[in-house]
């Protein structure tokens, strides 16, 4: 008789994913409101272009500290409780930001707001790994991020129209902040945490206490994550992910470089979001197919190809003046599609090379720390260098050259990814065997 359970399907996983996606959508909408309306905020509060870099960098840097804290708190108390507080009720700070009278006040409130929202990505992504098994994670992640981008893209032009309303950016912050509080209450009422390892074939049919036996998060375990070769390569790649700059400076780029108004430039957010949505769906589907057909190299090949594709499209879409917002919208859609492939690939890769109880910590390191550092450096650099050299030159080096380097770095995954996946599977097999014999083992990941 086999000791391995069939692939698990957690009951109610898609409705739960929808609820978590709603929370991430509102968080992202409020976080992007300042960047998309920065031209009018700049006029309202008398700021320079570099102020956008400072605001974005501060919001990312604070997440370096609070993201891991929220993951620890979720392990110490409850993932649901942390999400209710940090991604829901925390919206009151967005309301406060809407009352800012100068740059300093906006910086303080916006940074506090970001400190709470840093909980969303690592904890929610960890939960996805517990809701879906490896054969469906790509589609789940792709659908989640894609839908968020699609709805966000529809809201993008609407947010842009707030620039035509007196103090429209303030009304935007107030409205989204209030809605975020309501989403927090919805999570409190309807969300059901599946528990650690609920979708792993080796652990799904074990009782909760047995699955949670390894859930304690320690510094030793967290530090051991960076010794996983594939994870270390992904961290370096995240620091080279120049495409992150598009979401922050895309509208400002079109305003400053090609002379469009804020309202007109904001139109590209719709095709960008649609492209990102389709890229997520295609990326998630390709990821699951690649995982089945080539478990050793499939995901890596798709991820690498997405980086090269983005660099080519970014060069064509940012370095030439087409004089028509529709043409720029087309290229932004293609950039969104190439960028959208990433979540449905890199998140499942991280899940595959880390045991269930450490995925939250892994995503805190990957997203809250390394992605935040990269985003902060890009935003600060683009803000200050944009004032000196112009955003067109900055976009060439960050969106094109750096992304080509990123794709080359990912080639290193071909040597170690399969080995790291096998290591995790052997550990889970050992845990199941020990559980069936009434024992608990913790062989670790190093």
Put a short name on every predicted segment:
Residues 34-35, 228-281, 343:
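Extracytoplasmic gate region of multi-pass secondary transporters
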